Amino acid sequence: MSRRRGIMSSKLKEELAKELGFYDTVQAEGWGAIRAKDAGNMVKRAVELAQQQLKQ
C-alpha cells in the first residue's frame, strides 16, 4: 500500500517549523526527529491559518 500524500506543502511545513522554533531539528535530522508535541502544534497552527483564510 502506498503512503498517503500529505495535505500541507513542504514550503508551508518549513514556514511553520521556523515560526514554531524547531526548523533546526528538521534540517539536521529530518521530519521524523520532531517531537509529537511539535507536530501537534504545527497542525494546530495550520488549522488556525486555514480558518483565518476562510473568514476572508
From Swiss-Prot:
It comes from the Bacteria. The record marks 15-16 as: Cleavage. InterPro entries: SASP_alpha/beta-type, SASP_alpha/beta-type_CS, SASP_sf_alpha/beta. Keywords: DNA-binding, Sporulation. GO terms for molecular function: double-stranded DNA binding. Transmembrane segments: none annotated. Gene3D superfamilies: Small, acid-soluble spore protein, alpha/beta type-like. The keyword Coiled coil does not apply. It holds the Pfam family SASP. One of its GO terms (biological process) is DNA topological change. The keyword Cell division does not apply. Coiled coil: none annotated. May play some important role in either sporulation or the dormant spore. This is Protein SspF. It comes from Priestia megaterium (strain ATCC 12872 / QMB1551). The gene is sspF.
